[in-house]
């Protein structure tokens, strides 16, 4: 059985995440009382023929605060039963959450006559702290639209074929901010920039013209060798520490040329020694 626990602040995309998982064969339970997690695990062990092999549950601020505080011990009970379990935590910045609630006109579950929406959003972070601290994968949805969020969940959760560490090599542009879920960040803005070549400006690091230009630059090759050498040494240590997800972010200015080229090459090199390596280009189409 595979169990995915979905949590996060209201408005961050939990419903979308559950919908994606349901569309891909998961049996989904919304707003499960946290205290029922161990019971769910026991049923999985005792009644394998009755329980769906892929289950996703959401646990959020609608739970009793006392149950949320017990989440670490409840999760440990589940894992003690050798259930393949991942915790996904979704979040966005306060301003974005406020905007989303204003646009949808939905009521936040923690608002009252004496607690404003802004206060409720802040209080929710504290309530969900015990879950956020134990998340295997954190996704910041601040800059993601509905379709990007769906694609990201598919890439990170559904492309993980077996237990073990899933590695993501992600290109990005610093002008749109660093990925908040990155574990390792490499800044490649010091390398020659194809953007300043008029004939290359409108091409990307996936295209032959840019690839040939960058491959001919000694500094680019040296940077590539250094990063791959570092990752080949240290990523297995991440895997040995029972990390479920590790994100390696490669950043240039706009996220179109240098970082894309290097992310592709680095991802391909890592696949020679590591299982489950994915490549994503965050800002390529921005």
Swiss-Prot record:
SUPFAM superfamilies: P-loop containing nucleoside triphosphate hydrolases. InterPro entries: P-loop_NTPase, RapZ-like, RapZ-like_N, RapZ_C. GTP binds at residues 60-63. It holds the Pfam family RapZ-like_N. It comes from the Bacteria. ATP binds at residues 8-15. Keywords: ATP-binding, GTP-binding, Nucleotide-binding. The keyword ATP-binding applies. One of its GO terms (molecular function) is ATP binding. NCBIfam families: PRK05416.1. PANTHER family: RNASE ADAPTER PROTEIN RAPZ (PTHR30448:SF0). Displays ATPase and GTPase activities. Belongs to the RapZ-like family. This is Nucleotide-binding protein PSPA7_5038. It comes from Pseudomonas paraeruginosa (strain DSM 24068 / PA7).
